[in-house]
């Protein structure tokens, strides 16, 4: 039991803001944000997204390598709407194919809000995990810096997708409605 209590815990976070100018139909943005499955599918890779019910999704985050370990995060995402806003947050998380880590916790709190000129949003992504035994010789600060860099990369990828795909999807939705 002693070894379990001596595990080194690592924690890292990343934050991104987004400001999207919408040229046409800005008044329809609040209604568009109510289309949860459509909006979440435009923000994330729809090939890795599985609807679980109203306001609930499973998402297989793009896998990545950290010091020769293949990391495959899988998260359950909750989605809520409030006035002119859509919020996404992680309700559950685990790592597929990495039995070495049993205390992985991924957090996400992302909000996208309809404004007069378009959409504004912010996402905070965080991870808390014990230092895997295979990586015990690597200084924790180096692991945390690497983890923070990976999270920033994930958020930048999502931001790029949102900037490109969300406006296209919104315009398509406007044509359909």
Pin down the residues of each PLM region.
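A general secondary-structure signal for short beta-strands and their flanking turns/coil
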Residues: 9-15, 54, 72, 103-105, ...
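A conserved amphipathic terminal alpha-helix motif
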Residues: 136-177
């Amino acid at each position: 039991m002693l070894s379990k209590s001596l595990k080194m815990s690592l924690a890292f976070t990343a934050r991104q803001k987004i400001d999207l100018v919408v040229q046409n139909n800005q008044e329809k943005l609040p209604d568009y944000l109510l289309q949860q499955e459509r909006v979440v599918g435009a923000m994330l890779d729809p090939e890795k997204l599985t609807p679980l019910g109203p306001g609930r999704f499973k998402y297989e985050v793009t896998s990545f390598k950290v010091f020769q370990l293949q990391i495959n995060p899988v998260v359950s995402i909750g989605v809520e709407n409030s006035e002119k806003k859509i919020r996404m947050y992680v309700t559950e998380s685990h790592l597929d194919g990495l039995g070495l880590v049993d205390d992985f916790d991924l957090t996400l709190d992302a909000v996208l809000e309809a404004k007069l000129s378009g959409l504004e949003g912010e996402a905070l992504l965080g991870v808390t995990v014990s230092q895997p035994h295979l990586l015990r010789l690597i200084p924790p600060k180096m692991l945390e810096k690497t983890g923070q860099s990976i999270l920033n990369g994930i958020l930048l990828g999502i931001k790029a997708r949102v900037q490109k795909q969300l406006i296209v999807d919104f315009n398509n939705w406007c044509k359909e409605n």
